């Protein structure tokens, strides 16, 4: 109890500490990574009725099929969203909610079309091999090209599709650092 009181006493004063928005996310107990325009529109209507302020389209929005190991390019699936992802984002906004999407910007799936087209220095490396966990490579943000890729993804989502909220997730455990251009894996974290 005392530690909680102390933490609350030193916390900065700001509106975001007082009023957290109500966010609907379509993943848990709902679409489980299988979003489509047809499935999303009725959920958006119900989320609005329930008083939600944000609506997040979770994983799968970028893949025609199994989405887990195809992450990384972050281009909307035309099969899932025949009218485009922007159509769904615009519908969310028309209901007075902030549209959002799920991302794991720090990874690229082993089946992502871009994964084999970029040089190895985009990834954490150990013992001369790309580090991966659960079918995903860990991106190395020391590389300016990786930063440019991430910036381009965010810019596109915001400017082309009207995304106003990003749920940033992290679902792998790649271990400590990279040995590429470093004396040790830990040194590779220092940039």
Q: Where do the PLM segments sit?
A:
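Beta-strand-rich recognition/accessory modules
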Residues: 1-15
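Short, flexible, glycine/charge-rich loop motifs used to bind or transfer phosphoryl groups or to couple energy/partner
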Residues: 12-13, 45, 156
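Solvent-exposed loop and edge beta-strand segments that line ligand/cofactor-binding
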Residues: 13, 30-31, 77, 186-190
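Boundary/entry segment of secreted carbohydrate-active catalytic domains
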Residues: 17-31
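Structural preference for beta-strand elements that scaffold enzyme active sites
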Residues: 19-23, 53-56, 96-100, 163-167
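A short, mixed-charge helix-start or loop-turn motif at secondary-structure junctions
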Residues: 25-26, 70-71, 135-139
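Aromatic- and glycine-enriched glycan-recognition loops and surfaces
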Residues: 29-117, 148-152
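Active-site neighborhood of glycoside hydrolase catalytic domains
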Residues: 80-84, 88-94, 116-191
